[in-house]
């Protein structure tokens, strides 16, 4: 389930806001220019689906947001816990950075943690299946896919080179807990 926690950037121990309600999450994030939506597939997406099948299942929403925001390119990224480069991929965006274009991701499966640093606040957003998040260009943030990443996401771009991370060199991301999603309990 999606979750938003908001902290003072000097106090990673105690959230000032904590909600799993999608409407409440969207209402808080829109205050800092971030879009948060819940989408639903027009067709089921099965494990192992091709990128084309994934995009076809969400075609109406992809077309709508691409037209609204001027996206020229859409792709699908899929990362599984057994990926031999998972640690390298996780480490790539764990430090505070920004991009020169909006960072827009729709989670088809799995989860990840976007953490935004805006106006002396830290917004920790756990995105899960059916969540769309659009982080405006220039927003300081970091992303954690967890130690055993599992997600499939549709990514939107206006310019392929605009998505390069520009790192700030600050240590703030290290002050906040890393993402450790709870594993589903197995029936005994």
Swiss-Prot record:
Any single biological process term in GO: L-methionine salvage from S-adenosylmethionine
Site (May play a role in metal incorporation in vivo): 96
Site description May play a role in transmitting local conformational changes, residues in chain: 102
Necessary cofactors: Fe(2+); Ni(2+)
Cofactor note: Binds 1 Fe(2+) cation per monomer. Binds 1 nickel ion per monomer.
Enzyme class: oxidoreductase
Keywords from the named record: Amino-acid biosynthesis, Dioxygenase, Iron, Metal-binding, Methionine biosynthesis, Nickel, Oxidoreductase
Binding-site list for Fe(2+): 97, 99, 103, 141
Protein function: Catalyzes 2 different reactions between oxygen and the acireductone 1,2-dihydroxy-3-keto-5-methylthiopentene (DHK-MTPene) depending upon the metal bound in the active site. Fe-containing acireductone dioxygenase (Fe-ARD) produces formate and 2-keto-4-methylthiobutyrate (KMTB), the alpha-ketoacid precursor of methionine in the methionine recycle pathway. Ni-containing acireductone dioxygenase (Ni-ARD) produces methylthiopropionate, carbon monoxide and formate, and does not lie on the methionine recycle pathway.
Stated name of the protein: Acireductone dioxygenase
Organismal lineage: Bacteria, Pseudomonadati, Pseudomonadota, Gammaproteobacteria, Lysobacterales
């Amino acid at each position: 389930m999606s979750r938003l926690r908001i902290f003072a950037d000097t106090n990673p121990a105690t959230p000032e806001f904590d909600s799993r309600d999608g409407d409440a999450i969207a209402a808080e994030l829109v205050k800092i220019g971030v879009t948060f939506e819940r989408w639903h597939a027009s067709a089921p997406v099965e494990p192992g689906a091709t990128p084309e099948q994934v995009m076809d299942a969400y075609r109406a929403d992809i077309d709508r947001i691409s037209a609204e925001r001027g996206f020229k390119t859409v792709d699908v990224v899929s990362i599984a816990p057994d990926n031999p480069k998972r640690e390298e991929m996780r480490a790539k965006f764990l430090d505070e950075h920004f991009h020169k274009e909006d960072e827009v991701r729709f989670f088809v499966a799995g989860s990840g943690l976007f953490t935004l640093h805006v106006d002396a606040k830290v917004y920790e957003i756990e995105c899960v299946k059916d969540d769309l998040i659009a982080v405006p260009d220039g927003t300081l943030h970091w992303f954690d896919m967890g130690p055993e990443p599992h997600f499939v996401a549709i990514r939107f771009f206006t310019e392929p080179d605009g998505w390069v991370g520009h790192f700030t060199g600050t240590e703030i991301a290290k002050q906040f807990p890393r993402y450790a999603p709870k594993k589903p309990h197995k029936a005994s």
